[in-house]
Amino acid sequence: MNQLDNLKKFSKISADTGDVDLIRTYQIQHATTNPSLILKSPLFTTYLKLFNDAIDYAQKIGGNQNTKITNASDRLIVNIGSEILANISGYISTEIDAQLSFNTDLTIKKAHKLITMYQKKNIDTSRVLIKIAATWEGIQAAEELEKSGIKCNLTLVFSFAQARACAERNIYLISPFIGRIYDWYNQRNLIKTSYINDDPGIQSIKKIYHYYKTYGYNTIIMGASFRRLEQILALSGCDYLTISPHFLKQLYQNTNSVTRQLFPPKTIISHHIPVLDQSEFFQEHNKNQMAVEKLNEGIQQFSIDQQKLHKLLLNNLNVQLQK
């Protein structure tokens, strides 16, 4: 048995890719997408029909240039999400435009629009997770969406304050970014040993895991953003792990055994902990320089890739108009 199948015994695996062929190859149950991954996906081969449909859809709906770009982008991510769902048994995480990360109302509006678009394609939307950056505004939006039956994946989690606020508001799933935490400390020469348990990213997710399981929170933890295979193996037993094609291939080709590393406590503590309010959230989150920098950087990176996707769609909208 390969290492990937061994890992599946202890953690549910999500493919961190928009490439449905790779998802089929590794028989993955869940998948995550974002603008960066969509740009890397086979848009002009496997997904050419889906891409062209998004352009046609935007032209049919009409409106000004910005409206067409937005509609084409939304249609494309729903098209790709629907295609992936046809090849997996679990969830697809569909990301909200990162440029909305600090606007609760617009995030809620966009989420409902995407869910409606999935419904019109006869997709079971209980299998769609709306992916939102874990800003304070994003967490508030997700809380409202969860109340209306829309499951959310709060991404770009770097601080314990983010994780705690999500759990307290019954968010379905969070994605702590292990690799980006590691990067921040490693670039500053703040990691003293190569021992995996001294990895700040591993320490962060273990703290969240222990807290959630100790106090009986139902929010799922999905480890994301890995830099080394050792990081993935060190989190065997985490609820979910979303893994890039590079590491999926390594795990698939490796036959070494996998030992479970994370275990829930035998007893759950029934103890009322006051919910973090806005001022307490920012006070705790802002104590963590890494988390503040990495959250803002992540939003900026996703926003840049969203703009690249918009530019690609605009170019094709203009080409179609010239025909």
UniProtKB/Swiss-Prot annotation:
GO terms for cellular component: cytosol. It comes from the Bacteria. Transaldolase is important for the balance of metabolites in the pentose-phosphate pathway. Belongs to the transaldolase family. Type 1 subfamily. GO terms for molecular function: transaldolase activity. It catalyses: D-sedoheptulose 7-phosphate + D-glyceraldehyde 3-phosphate = D-erythrose 4-phosphate + beta-D-fructose 6-phosphate. NCBIfam families: PRK12346.1 (NF009001), talAB (TIGR00874). This is Transaldolase. Its main location: cytoplasm. It is found in: Cytoplasm. GO terms for biological process: carbohydrate metabolic process; pentose-phosphate shunt. Keywords: Cytoplasm, Pentose shunt, Schiff base, Transferase. Its EC number is 2.2.1.2. InterPro entries: Aldolase_TIM (IPR013785), TAL/FSA (IPR001585), Transaldolase_1 (IPR004730), Transaldolase_AS (IPR018225). PROSITE patterns: TRANSALDOLASE_1, TRANSALDOLASE_2. The active site is at K131. It comes from Blochmanniella floridana. Homodimer. Pathway: Carbohydrate degradation; pentose phosphate pathway; D-glyceraldehyde 3-phosphate and beta-D-fructose 6-phosphate from D-ribose 5-phosphate and D-xylulose 5-phosphate (non-oxidative stage): step 2/3.
